[in-house]
């Protein structure tokens, strides 16, 4: 009888850290693993990732590594002990002494990060109409890598974000592509924009794609939301007050007002790592 609790206690770490197939952690794999986690904590993701940010705020900046290991793009990195090993080599991140948690060495200046986000949006395009009807959740990581390879052949990019339907969390056929520079972004738009019929047609697996600026995409999304609220659509080129939905005043959560700007920014991000 006395051995059973001891056996269960020994099995818990095994379940948490070794529930997926073990892969060979070559130096290249360790580097990819580290860069992925550093991205989660970067100025381009952390301020706008509500789940990650609130988790850190509850624990003095620390986030459980076991939580990060459940993100879709991290599930392939097993055992988790190797992830911890990779994170210990980071110049940006710090691992707790017990190896259970990770945080930024230097906290982000959120105001500066939001200014960086504005500049980031200026070099981001929305590319729509990718095949998506038959894409299952288990196929998302592979699709992510395929789309990254697709766009890297066409320009210098920083990242590709897959958009999801907020109702069923499935890929909705739209990706946000962030380029390294504004000129790179403008050159891509000039080559593939649907506004000019003489432009080269951008396609993927035989399907013609549509290219919009981030601003055009946001206006289209707002128009769609407005139509859902009022039954009437708005022009993508302007805002008509009579068609704008009326939102209630910001509700207080835990004694603090929730920022409208913050909520809008979060809605722009895909949430692939939270499933």
UniProtKB/Swiss-Prot annotation:
Residue span(s) of domain HTH La-type RNA-binding: 23-112
Organism: Saccharomyces cerevisiae (strain ATCC 204508 / S288c)
Name of the protein: La protein homolog
S-S pairs: none
Pfam families per UniProt: La, RRM_1
Gene3D superfamilies in the cross-refs: 3.30.70.330, Winged helix-like DNA-binding domain superfamily/Winged helix DNA-binding domain
Omega-N-methylarginine: modified positions: 104
Bias-annotated ranges (Polar residues): 226-236
PANTHER family assigned: ACHILLES, ISOFORM A, LUPUS LA PROTEIN-RELATED
Region (Disordered): 222-275
Function recorded in the entry: Molecular chaperone that binds nascent RNA polymerase III transcripts, stabilizing these RNAs against exonucleases. Required for the 3' endonucleolytic cleavage that matures tRNA precursors and for efficient folding of certain pre-tRNAs. Cooperates with GCD14 in the maturation of a subset of RNA polymerase III transcripts. Functions also in the assembly of certain RNA polymerase II-transcribed RNAs into RNPs. Binds and stabilizes newly synthesized U6 snRNA as well as precursors of U3 snRNA from degradation. Facilitates efficient Sm protein binding, thus assisting formation of the U4/U6 snRNP.
Record keywords, A-Z: Acetylation, Methylation, Nucleus, Phosphoprotein, RNA-binding
Domain RRM: 123-216
GO cellular component: nucleolus; nucleoplasm; nucleus; ribonucleoprotein complex
Record bears the keyword Acetylation: yes
Quaternary assembly: Interacts with SXM1.
Residues with N-acetylserine modification: 2
Phosphoserine PTM positions: 15, 19, 230, 233, 235
Example GO BP: tRNA processing
GO MF terms held by the record: mRNA binding; RNA binding; tRNA binding; U6 snRNA binding
Compartments reported by the entry: Nucleus
Comp. bias regions, Basic residues: 237-254
Record PTM text: Phosphorylation is not required for the roles tRNA and snRNP biogenesis.
InterPro entries reported in the protein's UniProt record: La_dom_prot (IPR045180), La_HTH (IPR006630), Lupus_La (IPR002344), Nucleotide-bd_a/b_plait_sf (IPR012677), RBD_domain_sf (IPR035979), RRM_dom (IPR000504), WH-like_DNA-bd_sf (IPR036388), WH_DNA-bd_sf (IPR036390)
Superkingdom, natural source: Eukaryota
């Amino acid at each position: 009888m006395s051995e059973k609790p001891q056996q269960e206690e020994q099995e818990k770490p095994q379940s948490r850290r070794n529930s997926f197939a073990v892969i060979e952690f070559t130096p290249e794999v360790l580097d990819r693993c580290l860069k992925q986690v550093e991205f989660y904590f970067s100025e381009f993701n952390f301020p706008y990732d509500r789940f990650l940010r609130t988790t850190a705020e509850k624990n003095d900046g620390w986030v459980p590594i076991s939580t990060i290991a459940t993100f879709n793009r991290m599930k392939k990195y097993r055992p988790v002990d190797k992830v911890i090993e990779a994170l210990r080599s980071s110049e940006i991140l710090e691992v707790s002494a017990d190896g259970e948690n990770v945080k930024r060495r230097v906290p982000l200046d959120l105001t500066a990060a939001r200014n960086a986000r504005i500049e980031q949006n200026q070099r981001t395009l929305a590319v729509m109409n990718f095949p998506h009807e038959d894409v299952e959740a288990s196929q998302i990581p592979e699709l992510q890598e395929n789309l990254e390879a697709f766009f890297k052949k066409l320009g210098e990019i920083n990242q590709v974000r897959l958009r999801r339907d907020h109702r069923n969390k499935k890929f909705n056929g739209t990706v946000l592509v962030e380029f390294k520079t504004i000129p790179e972004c403008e050159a891509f738009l000039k080559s593939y924009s649907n506004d000019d019929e003489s432009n080269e047609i951008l396609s993927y697996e035989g399907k013609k794609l549509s290219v919009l600026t981030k601003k055009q995409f946001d206006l289209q999304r707002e128009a769609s939301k407005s139509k859902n609220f009022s039954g009437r659509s708005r022009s993508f080129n302007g805002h008509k007050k009579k068609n704008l939905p009326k939102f209630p005043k910001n509700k207080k959560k835990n004694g603090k007002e929730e920022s409208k700007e913050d909520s809008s920014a979060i809605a722009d991000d895909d949430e692939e790592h939270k499933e």
